[in-house]
Amino acid sequence: MASPFTRIFSDLHYGDRSSTLRELASLRPLLDGPDRVIFNGDTLDTRPSRHPERVAELRGSVLDFVQHHAPPATLITGNHDPDISDVHALELAEGEVLVSHGDVIFDDLVPWSRDAAQMGRLMREALATFSETERATLAARLRAMRRAAAQIPQRHHTESDALKHAIGLFTDMCWPPTRVLRVVQAWRDTPRLAAALLAQHRPAARVFVMGHTHRAGVRQIGDGKWLINTGAFCPPTRACVVDVSAEKLVVREVERRRGVYRIGSTRAEFSLAAEPATVTLAA
């Protein structure tokens, strides 16, 4: 009998025309098999919008789908859905695996965004409401980030009009002019910042599973420490799932065929029973 396992993926961005996810039902093959599912942030955009009725509709659709068509599920918050639940991080495999959306590693949440300076300020203000002792904890940092994210309004993200969405997306991609450089710099900084977060807050964890940067991959970030990014359902990036059981962790690609998402090839496999963890990477 196969061991029970939890499946993790992130950054569906449902309701955003930038996402390839048009129908929630197309996720069903990904939900066939796991005993539990974790949606690791940015499942949709719940922030203030010029179209609140659209946000409410999308939110209702997601919650209904998760309740009726998925295994027991946990929705972890992200910077786009800071109020989707009160869960900001989870630990699996007796603390071996830390799961969080990933923006927690950045002081300004989304350093490539035109809102980065404002988010950094809001983050500092939110952290200041905690005691000095609390500010040193991961829980306080995550709560402060969600407060900050909830105050940043959407731009084009749930715009249903194709032309308006395209204009908004183009503007976001081109402004500020340094945006591409900021994205690349964030990619470069991510392994170092993720390693620092584990060292400070979860030194016993051997694997950090995140999304946020839309760059799927598996990377060693220290002696026996690994960073796994599940990518996104938004081109040109690809999405991955992470399956975690008591004995092992497996990273698999997500393939989209005829509008339906399915499990693809294995990218990496970790034996959590070994000390240190043994890792097999796909060629």
Annotate each language-model stretch with its function:
Residues A2-F9, Y14-E96:
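Core catalytic region of metal-dependent phosphoesterases/phosphodiesterases
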Residues D16, A56-R59, V218, L227-A283:
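Long, positively charged, glycine-interspersed low-complexity recognition regions
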Residues S26-R54, H157-H165, P177-A205:
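N-terminal short leaders/motifs
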Residues T46, P82, F106, P236, ...:
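Flexible, glycine-rich phosphate/dinucleotide-binding loops
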Residues D64-I76, L193-V207, T280:
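Short, basic/low-complexity N-terminal boundary segments at the transition from targeting/disordered tails
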Residues H88-E96, A126-L142, Y261-A273:
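A short, terminal or domain-edge coil/loop segment
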Residues L90-L122, W187-R252:
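Conserved beta-sheet core of the metallophosphoesterase superfamily
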Residues G102-R192:
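Active-site-proximal loop/helix segment associated with metal-binding centers of metalloenzymes
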